[in-house]
Amino acid sequence: LTLKEIKIFDCGSLNPDVLRFPQPPRKNIPGEKIPTLQEVFDLLAEYPNNNIWLNIEIKISPEFKVTAPIDVFVKAVVQVIEHNNAANKVNIQSFDWRVLESVKIQAPYIKTAALLGQSTFKSINDSVPSPWLNGIHFENSGGTALAILHEAQNYIDIFSPSWRLIMPKDSLFLGNTVNELKNNGFPVIPWTINRTKTMEKVILQGVDGIITDYPDSLLMVMEKMGIKRR
């Protein structure tokens, strides 16, 4: 799609999932369009005294060749960040770890966050790694979250896994607690946590942040637990 075509979509009213995002509490804003990254920075410029950090995700699938080449995609994003002198106010995250390596090659001063899903770490077979991990074979590397992070430590600053992967009692636990990951230099920001009970559980585990569709719920939990906003 061209930018002109994307701008036709009314993202302020059309709800792709009424079960996940019921109304209320979701509020309609008719006519709202999908912004470009530059338009997001323009909006932030209206609030210069607010400490706002952008978590920018580059969505590329190694399984479907439907986007621009990785280096081209990354370069376009980095250029907008640098144009706005915002390198110290962003991090770039991606499920495709090749993206993160490209970011560090092009702009080593920009922080990166490695997204990891409940299936993206799984190798194809004994000799072929997951296409998402930039050539790292999960099982052959040691079969833990920390093992694959150590192999990618030159281009990963933050670990952002599905929250179930860091919960010791969960069947999907990848072998390392939040404290172990943090003690090895990897801040932990799990996704996507929308239930308040789960928010409380991961906060007690010591996570550095939470990705959620409901920041208002997270703020309520933080207030209940006596946690101040940074």
Kindly give the residue locations of the regions a language model identified:
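Metal-dependent phosphodiesterase/phospholipase catalytic core, i.e.
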Residues: 1-120, 132-136, 140-148, 154-156, ...
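C-terminal active-site rim and adjoining tail of enzyme catalytic domains
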Residues: 115-116, 122-230
